Amino acid sequence: LGCGSGAIAVALAARDPGLQVWAVDSHARAVEATRVAAKLNELENLQVVLTHTAEVPEPGTFDLVTCNPPYFADFEIARRFLDGTVRALKSGGDCILVTKLPNWYREHAGQWLEDVEVWTSGNYHLVRGRRA
């Protein structure tokens, strides 16, 4: 969710052609950039979706959701990403989210996910959690 230019989705799809990867974003330019990257890399296992609701095809079936919500926006957007993540993931599925503001996720991500952990790499933080 929030695929942006598609770097993470393209890397996952290229790494394992057996994966089915969905890239979702609300910005048409981001979706187009991801589609171009998928085509240039000849990735038939990467589907790209433009949506403003964080809805995904086949909710409750995803093993992994990666999220890259805006770093300096209202946390209402983060809540929408987490709502969409829970709808997308199957039970036991994982979420990995990138942020520069980990404290909010440390305090609140447990409302959506269990076993929440935060890892730091430079100025970025990865938040990992699992759907019950």
Language-model features: where?
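Core SAM-dependent methyltransferase catalytic element
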Residues: 119-132
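Conserved SAM/SAH cofactor-binding pocket of Class I
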Residues: 1-67
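Short beta->alpha hinge that forms the Motif I/post-I loop of the SAM-binding pocket
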Residues: 25-29, 77, 100-101
